[in-house]
Amino acid sequence: MARIAGVNIPNHQHAEIALTAIYGIGRARAREICEAAGINVSTKMKDVTDAEMDKLRDNVAKFVVEGDLRREVSMNIKRLMDLGCYRGLRHRRGLPVRGQRTRTNARTRKGPRKAVRASSAKAGR
């Protein structure tokens, strides 16, 4: 297995698919990187030579990927939360940020249901 940007790249996959194992690289960017390195996208990673692998590493290094990208995304979210804007408040409360309904659905973001207690229901009457 080759390592690019600190990630083990699977040998049995085509170059285009294998590069998507790196956080921040999707199919389109993987295809772009392969073309820049002069590698056919359907070439299996085990068939890529060392010189071609170096070209791949150089091309991947031009983009913000893995730890740097994760840090950048988390800092953007933290900035929104510090500003106190609507999106930041939604992040802080653990609710959907992009306008989805919350009366029903949104279970992934809200977490498991909280059971209604019988004693608190009687106290509310």
Curated annotation (Swiss-Prot):
Organism: Nitrosospira multiformis (strain ATCC 25196 / NCIMB 11849 / C 71)
A molecular function (GO) term: structural constituent of ribosome
GO biological process, one term: translation
Skewed-composition ranges (Basic residues): 94-116
Record GO cellular component, one term: cytosol
Described function: Located at the top of the head of the 30S subunit, it contacts several helices of the 16S rRNA. In the 70S ribosome it contacts the 23S rRNA (bridge B1a) and protein L5 of the 50S subunit (bridge B1b), connecting the 2 subunits; these bridges are implicated in subunit movement. Contacts the tRNAs in the A and P-sites.
PROSITE patterns: RIBOSOMAL_S13_1 (PS00646), RIBOSOMAL_S13_2 (PS50159)
Annotated region (Disordered), positions in chain: 94-125
UniProt similarity note: Belongs to the universal ribosomal protein uS13 family.
One Pfam family here: Ribosomal_S13
Subunit record text: Part of the 30S ribosomal subunit. Forms a loose heterodimer with protein S19. Forms two bridges to the 50S subunit in the 70S ribosome.
Record protein name field: Small ribosomal subunit protein uS13
Keyword tags: Ribonucleoprotein, Ribosomal protein, RNA-binding, rRNA-binding, tRNA-binding
Keyword field contains rRNA-binding: yes
UniProt keyword Ribosomal protein, yes or no: yes
Intrachain disulfide bonds: none
InterPro entries documented for this protein: Rbsml_uS13_C, Ribosomal_uS13, Ribosomal_uS13-like_H2TH, Ribosomal_uS13_bac-type, Ribosomal_uS13_CS
